[in-house]
Curated annotation (Swiss-Prot):
Similarity comment text for this entry: Belongs to the class II ribonucleoside-triphosphate reductase family.
Protein name as it appears in the record: Putative adenosylcobalamin-dependent ribonucleoside-triphosphate reductase
Gene Ontology MF term list: cobalamin binding; nucleotide binding; ribonucleoside-diphosphate reductase activity, thioredoxin disulfide as acceptor; ribonucleoside-triphosphate reductase (thioredoxin) activity
InterPro entries, alphabetized: RdRp_reductase_class-2 (IPR050862), RNR-II_ins_dom (IPR054158), RNR_alpha_hel (IPR040763), RNR_lg_C (IPR000788), RTP_Rdtase_AdoCbl-dep (IPR013345)
Catalysed transformations (reactions): a 2'-deoxyribonucleoside 5'-triphosphate + [thioredoxin]-disulfide + H2O = a ribonucleoside 5'-triphosphate + [thioredoxin]-dithiol
Organism of provenance: Mycobacterium phage Bxz2
Cofactor(s) essential for the protein: adenosylcob(III)alamin
Length: 672
């Protein structure tokens, strides 16, 4: 019997349970066996430990270890073992390489980070002003919708011999984008009218077998090609060069195309260096344009930045910090990323993080994540299973190292993956673990036993990685430990997410389900019949929202073990100061994570202003590889809404274990 968290089975069925050949859905034990067997098959059986398969199955079924979402979705799937959640897209001598890589990884269901600092982007003038014409067979089911949207050419038709016929595949879509961008950069072009035939692209709503979800049809692709052409043609008309901001606009157009299906999600991270000539435009790009909603925004800082801030607190560097912190307090962006601190211990330069910020990566490199659920090893009487924790960390390390042998689509990624073998062993359920051990979250920084435990577990990971690398005759992973937000993963066992404190002891949790997916549509109907409030999403098409009054189950667990007066052991985000939140992140960054820590410090904008945040960043800036500070603002259909204990008791409630927002902008990851 699976011991689900209160919304765990819903999240599992929505996100990770695959449809079997007979049309039925996987159960959790079936998913676990698929994932474990797929992972073990990546290396020869002689490299398996005695009983390793049985141990992995048991620990995963009990939610004591959980690999990253891509592993749960794709491991063991024939011809589709795309096991890596996120990537960094770099820049080569050919501008289309970056955009092709971004498009392909997003279409595979991954997230992509990129550094748009202009020092990376030097391609000379855009040579050609072009015009895109979209043509389509009138018998295509989406023809009328495309005609109504105004994207079809009035000058060309599908019979024109010079049309570029777009094949109905990820590679086919990307080939059309590459053709367009490369043509913009050619010295000589015979045809300035670029005609793209979308007749072979499957219709809107068709099922996508490999990655799940439904097809968006040819309309979003047509719009993307038109948008990209307009961006580059405007630059060509002015005799200009591609800039970091313009490249962001192209990637935004690409991401909009990918998410248009209603089920598929994309996640992106955009960075720019603090000394870049476009930095002020970058810092305000979302507010000023109302666009770029497909990406998170983070400012690249370094040691020079923090020195300059201290030496010239009232100077221009403070202006950048002021813009940064005013944005944080207003809407949670930008965050910052410390490239100097992140490059310590790296054999080659890392240029960006994945969209959630827990892994710093070289160009083309993927993140490779797995997690140990600390809460599952707490006995609830002040003790914990230290032997079990060691075993779990050792097995997750080996699991992720085997995953580095999985196929990747791009040879640039293969080269860096083989060279670095980077893994990210992380924790979830940390706040739950602390409370069940009788320790307060706010006191963890001075808790010597907890700090000893983190150091000991880090040593176990490092030892296991070194030992296994020598057996496999591969390089020891350049870095091994991280903290991911685990927003979706943690919901299955119903524990706190990553190292975040719980959101609130009592709250309304809103679950979003896609109306484009038949299974999720049935879930919406079931919730409505049970009396829950169900409404259309105000922010996303084809999406419904279910509101569930909630008591965080950690409260009940702690009271069960420590008595009615122990509720104060469970500290929520609202109980903690910004200093305590950033201090906890710094603890994990300095003791546990050689990669990075993804963490969102939620603050009340009525309590903290930009000056308050600036002072805290001055204290912690040199210790943290990155930070995201998010204002808790009341908004319609917020994923979480605090309520009082009395309000909860008055409601018809289901106990739900939860933490922070699943939305990537709030520090968690929508990529499964």
């Amino acid at each position: 019997m699976t011991n689900w968290g209160p919304t765990g089975e819903l999240v599992y069925n929505r996100t990770y349970s695959r449809t079997k050949p007979d049309g039925s859905k996987e159960t959790w034990p079936e998913t676990v066996r698929r994932v474990v067997d797929g992972n073990l098959a990546l290396v020869d059986e002689r490299y398996h430990l005695p009983g390793e398969r049985a141990d992995l199955i048991r620990l995963m079924e009990e939610f004591k270890i959980l690999p990253g979402g891509r592993h749960l979705w794709a491991s063991g799937v024939k011809n589709a073992q795309h096991l890596f959640n996120c990537w960094v897209s770099g820049w080569t001598e050919k501008p289309s390489d970056h955009f092709e890589f971004t498009f392909m990884r997003l279409m595979e269901g991954g997230g992509v980070g990129a550094n748009y600092s202009n020092r990376f982007i030097d391609y000379g003038p855009v040579q050609q002003e072009l015009y895109v014409h979209i043509v389509c067979d009138p018998d295509h089911p989406d023809y009328e919708a495309m005609k109504e949207a105004g994207v079809l050419s009035t000058e060309y038709d599908p019979d024109w011999a010079g049309a570029f016929v777009i094949e109905d595949s990820r590679e086919g879509w990307a080939a059309a984008l590459v053709d367009l961008i490369d043509t913009h950069y050619r010295d000589e072009v015979s045809h300035f009218q670029r005609v793209y035939d979308v007749s072979r692209v499957r219709q809107f709503g068709a099922k996508l077998k490999t990655f799940g979800g439904t097809a968006s049809g040819p309309l979003p692709l047509a719009r993307m090609l038109i948008d990209v052409c307009e961006i580059l043609s405007e630059i060509a008309t002015e005799g200009g060069q591609l800039t970091g901001i313009a490249a962001m606009e192209i990637d935004h157009a690409i991401a909009q195309c990918v998410v248009a299906g209603g089920v598929r999600r994309s996640a992106r991270m955009s960075m720019m260096h603090w000394k870049d000539p476009q930095v002020y435009e970058f810092l305000r790009i979302k507010q000023d344009t109302g666009s770029h909603w497909t990406t998170n925004i983070s400012l690249e800082v370094d040691d020079e930045f923090w020195v300059a801030v201290e030496e010239g607190w009232a100077g221009p560097n403070n202006r950048i910090l002021r813009e940064l912190t005013e944005g944080m307090v207003a809407n949670g962006e930008p965050g910052f990323w410390n490239s100097s601190l992140s490059n310590v211990g790296e054999p080659n330069e890392v240029v960006c993080t994945n969209p959630c910020g827990e892994i710093t990566l070289e160009p083309w490199e993927p993140c490779n994540l797995g997690h140990v659920n600390l809460a599952a090893f707490a006995h609830g009487n002040g003790s914990y299973d230290i032997t079990g924790l060691y075993r779990a960390h050792r097995l997750v390390t080996r699991f992720l190292m085997r995953a580095t042998f999985s196929p990747v689509a791009d040879p640039k990624s293969r080269e860096v993956l083989d060279r670095n073998r980077r893994i990210g062993v992380g924790h979830l359920g940390v706040a739950s673990f602390l409370a069940l051990c009788g320790w307060k979250y706010s006191e963890a920084r001075t808790n010597e036993e907890f700090k000893w435990l983190l150091r000991s577990l880090a040593e176990e990971v490092d030892h296991a990685a070194t030992q296994f690398a020598h057996q496999l005759r591969i390089p020891v992973p350049v870095k091994k430990r991280t903290v991911a937000p685990t927003g979706t993963i943690a919901k299955m066992p119903g524990v706190s997410e990553g190292i975040h404190p719980i959101f609130s002891r009592y709250f309304i949790r809103r679950v979003r389900l896609s109306m484009s997916d038949p299974d999720q549509t049935r879930m919406l109907a079931d919730y409505g019949r049970q009396g829950y409030e169900v409404e259309d999403d105000l922010y996303a098409k084809f999406t419904g929202v279910v509101s569930i009054p909630t008591q965080d189950t950690l409260v009940a667990e702690v009271i069960e073990h420590y008595g009615q007066d122990s509720e104060s052991l469970v500290e929520s985000a609202a109980d903690l100061s910004l200093n305590e939140l950033l201090g906890f992140q710094a603890l994990y960054q300095t003791i546990w994570a050689d990669n990075a820590v993804s963490f969102t410090a939620n603050v009340d904008p009525e309590t903290y202003n930009a000056d308050d945040v600036r002072q805290q960043l001055r204290l912690f800036g040199g210790l943290l590889k990155g930070a995201t500070i998010f204002p808790e603002a009341s908004m319609p259909q917020a994923p979480y809404e605090r309520i009082t204990k009395e309000q909860y008791e008055q409601a018809t409630a289901k106990a739900v274990a939860d933490g922070v927002d699943e939305d990537c902008a709030n520090g968690a990851c929508p990529i499964r």
